[in-house]
Amino acid sequence: MDEKIIKKNAVPVIAAMITALAFSFTGLPMDGNTSAKKMSDVYNGLGCMSLLAWILLLILYVKGWEGYRKYRNWQAHVLAVIFSAGMLLGTSYFTNGNWDFLFGAKKQILISAGCFIGFYIICDMGITYFWRIPEMEFFRKACGRIPAREEEVMWFRLAKISMIIGWTPFILAFLPGSIPADGFRQLDVFLGAMPLDNHHPWVLTMIMGGLLTLGKTIWCYNFGVFLIVIVFTSVEIWCYSAVVRYLYRWKAPKWILFGTVLLFAFVPIFGSYAQAVIKDGLYTAVITLYFAVYIDICHSFSKRKAVYLFLLGISVCLTRNNGIHLVLPSLILLFFFLVKGARKYAFIVAVCVFACYLGVEKGAAPALGVAPGSRCEMLSVPFQQTARYLREYPDDVTASEKKAINRILDYDVLAEKYNPELSDPVKITFRFRDNDEDPKLDGYMKDYFKAWFAMFRRHPGVYIQATLNNTYSYNDPFHLGRGQQGVYRFYIDKLYQKKAGIDVSYVGPKKIQYIFRLYDELWMRAPGLGLILSAGTYTWLTLLLMGYLMVKKQWKKILIFAIPVLNILICLVSPVNGLIRYMWPVMTIMHYADAVLVDSAAGTKNAFKLKKIHHFIKTSFIQNADRSP
């Protein structure tokens, strides 16, 4: 009997040891000269926390190994490989700024392979059990309730009141509101202190400037800033409350409803951005509601919902410049969700959104003298690769390549200014920031990319490392990027303030503001809570939910995740590594996209079945489906 127990538990015990060892490496590479004294820098497996982690892993593996062997599948294996690679790369780049932890000396390759195995085991096991949760009885019992109109209104009001309670302390502490660089730049553009351009959405710039001017007319600039904060906050609260309402309609269990309300009301990123004059809070709220209507129109089509989708779609496009890159593909994919009778409406919505967007950006903007945004904003990846190349191989550049680079960027300072996790210092050297329409630029860009490609052929590894170093935190939840310059915007930018001469200042005591700053930073560093504000968490959640739908062979539902996937891809070419502000829309979407998983697990009839959609199409043209957005 004892022999059987030993044989049965031998594999999980060894697996737990390998995983514990993998988590004990610091990320520093070990070369051939590493002495025993320096091993503590490379490996730290002693201490209470390491012992506790090993005991916990041992219990989990021994208890869950049989179930893991029974339910594991190839989809989980693939995801586990992706997650493990992300963790390894994140560890290496966070610690060293390169991939030496993976591909250093020969010994190091063996160490990294062992770490990969340890990470793989826990990821594979975790994914397998995560996908089993919806099949469990307690989960099924929580689903499938019948919605009631009174309760629906109650949840809408509860969400609204909770957000008012959770956000108001931030707004009061930083009265009249923080104005970070991005927000102040928009105000400066409106007031004529800077050229009128579309670096930030110009329509939103006009709205912000109009509210500022109205407040100044009524009282003072402080009141104008407060007016922007209050108007934007009111819209955001309404959007998020409507999302909770949709969740209730979809028969989401109460724990998802409560969790979503708590997320929106009390996770500090929401309150922290509510008090700031910046586009991100408004954009995130609008695209979150857009995604809710998008899912709802898949559940049950109606003309009214198509109108809501159009209005929200164009709002997304006008609150962030890359919004069109999320909205248009999602509307094209909507065509495949609906049966023939409804597809024409998806096509009409897509055409109307695109036509309105072109009318605003290509018609109204030039007529009003709005200059287009600089093209350098889209070139973070190649600019970072060039700068890293010059840092690593400054002598391996030909005269013609140097000339081509220098026409576009300041060649002499690129290597010095290069920040592996933030492309802004390199982009600032772009020579055509204020003259993007110069006819010479197109020719210069062709020469630059010829040089860029020639250098890539000589040292491709540098380019790969530059990209990995600028993106690892989007793939690894456990290492926050170092290029963020502060996650929250608790300041009034003095540089932009001087340009327009706007007299704005905080009215609250600095001690209270310090408490809120400290609270936000502690939240980010707290075990468990910090993962809520880690960009990599939402890349993983997106892949987990998509993987579950693949296992269930619900291929059409995977298309619903077009918006999160496109947002993640945009993050990967963004200027900052692991910035949660860029991943914020995916955060808000993921915490109610779980309703799709619930719908799949509960076995409820849903509109992803064509017959159900067809039934709603027939009835929607006669009856009004829903009267609230």
PLM regions with names:
Residues 156-158, 240-266, 284-285:
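Transmembrane-helix signature of polytopic, membrane-embedded enzymes
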Residues 306-320, 352-357:
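Membrane-interface alpha helices of multi-pass inner-membrane proteins
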Residues 121, 227-250, 289:
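Transmembrane-helix motifs of polytopic, lipid-linked glycan transferases
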Residues 35-51, 223, 227, 469-561:
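Membrane-interface anchor segments at the N-terminal boundary of transmembrane helices
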Residues 121, 191, 282-299, 313, ...:
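Specific aromatic-rich, kink-prone transmembrane helix
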Residues 272-282, 319:
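Short acidic/glycine- and proline-prone juxtamembrane loop motifs at membrane-interface regions
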Residues 174-188, 195-211, 218-223, 585:
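Extracytoplasmic catalytic/substrate-binding loops of multi-pass membrane glycan-assembly enzymes
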Residues 369-507:
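Membrane-proximal stem/loop segments at transmembrane-domain junctions that anchor or position
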